[in-house]
From Swiss-Prot:
InterPro entries referenced in this protein's UniProt entry, alphabetically: Urease_beta-like, Urease_betasu_sf, Urease_subunit
Entry protein name: Urease subunit beta
Catalytic activity: urea + 2 H2O + H(+) = hydrogencarbonate + 2 NH4(+)
Entry-linked HAMAP family: Urease_beta
Organism the protein comes from: Staphylococcus aureus (strain JH9)
Length: 136
């Protein structure tokens, strides 16, 4: 062995193999590329990404640490998400959680929410979060 040498296994390393997986379709409805990193709380990703936000609550991309997924304008692709482990507390990002991951804290659109949003013209294709998530 050489000092500082790293000896790795000859087999592939499986990541997140003990976490439940969720696959969702995501579309970039914006006019600029959007990149989401491996540990970013996907529920809080850029509002120009159109997807079922409820499905992403408490989850991050199932990719190696330090990697990212890039969405070009108009891109539509499926991504695989896995649940956060550990203490399951999320702070920062867009400030939509700032505490424990708890399903009761997920924003779920209702007819009343949609009627209220309609007053301000937020009821058509321009509503990038029409499938769920927090309206900003």
């Amino acid at each position: 062995m050489i000092p500082g040498e790293i000896i790795t296994k000859s087999t592939e390393v499986e990541i997140n193999n003990h976490h439940p997986e969720t696959v969702i379709e995501v579309e970039n409805t914006g006019d600029r590329p959007i990149q989401v990193g491996s540990h970013f709380h996907f529920y809080e990703a850029n509002a120009a990404l159109d997807f079922e936000r409820e499905m992403a609550y408490g989850k991050h991309l199932d990719i190696p640490a330090g990697a990212a997924v890039r969405f070009e304008p108009g891109d539509k692709k499926e991504v695989q998400l896995v649940e956060y482990a550990g203490k399951r507390k999320i702070f920062g990002f867009r400030g939509m959680v700032n505490g424990p991951i708890d399903e009761s804290r997920v924003y779920r659109p209702t007819d009343e929410n949609d009627a209220y949003a309609g007053v301000f013209g937020d009821n058509g294709a321009e509503n990038v979060n029409k499938k769920g998530g927090k309206r900003s």
